[in-house]
């Protein structure tokens, strides 16, 4: 009875002085403990969500499971130091979970990636060949039917995809190994009607070819070198593209002839320079040039007005009649032949000509008939 009376008296005193009772203190402790547990569980659920989102890039052996971690409960013993230590331990565990482990790629993954890239390049190669074949068929139909509405647009439509693949540096070896340059050669070849491909196709493909590490074996396998040489010699190719083709040919032929691209290894031909010989040659050339100029001036002086006018109009003119004087008479080297023909007088041999006799007889007959 005394104990109960003391409890009641304590409760009454606490109520009187505004102090919390023992029951209220216990309830408050349980509420604090519940809040701490709920907050820890909420943090663990967030970490579990983060861990599951990163599972695609991690191996199965390195996966972390939040559910396996023990949940630290906080008691209502009022020990602040112990509570802070457990909280720090939980935070340390969560920091370890947040650290993303390095992804380890196995050899099998690398082989799968190479196989995927090879298949991608081979599919693009087939698409390029089909597009070129369709354009050729379209041009052949246009030549046969004469219908100018038939336009070959397959290669132009596929061009952006081709250029995007050719410009990727990480695909350079795959492109060369799968002989995609053969399809590039087909695209650059002249069309059945003798015309060249679209200028956009020429410009884009030559720019992409320039960035590829093409070697001699790749040129032999694809046949691209012949088409590039054609572009260096054709007069229908744009000037900048022709110069780019010349540069590519020079770069590709350098390892074939054993030439180095280092300027220090460049061989410069040298020869001795004779100053006196150069002066004599220059004087002789100047004398010849003066003689030619003088002859040209004399020729202009002797031309008639008609010839000068024709020369100004860049026309041909009939040569003017001139009188030629000879200082020395030619000497005959033909021996005198003794004949029975009378050589005295001008036209003395006409009477001995049979043709002349026949003409005279005809003239005489015509006079008699009159």
From Swiss-Prot:
Keyword Translocase tagged: no
Highest rank taxon of the organism: Eukaryota
Gly residues bias locations: 75-85
Biased composition (Polar residues): 1-12, 62-71
InterPro entries on file: RNAPII_TF_IWS1, TFIIS/LEDGF_dom_sf, TFIIS_N
Protein location: Nucleus
UniProt region (Disordered), positions on chain: 1-86
UniProt-listed PROSITE patterns: TFIIS_N
Keyword vocabulary terms for this entry: Nucleus, Transcription, Transcription regulation
One Pfam match: Med26
Keyword presence, Nucleus: yes
GO CC term (a single one): nucleus
Function recorded in the entry: Transcription factor involved in RNA polymerase II transcription regulation. May function in both SPT15/TBP post-recruitment and recruitment steps of transcription.
Family per similarity comment: Belongs to the IWS1 family.
Protein name per UniProt: Transcription factor IWS1
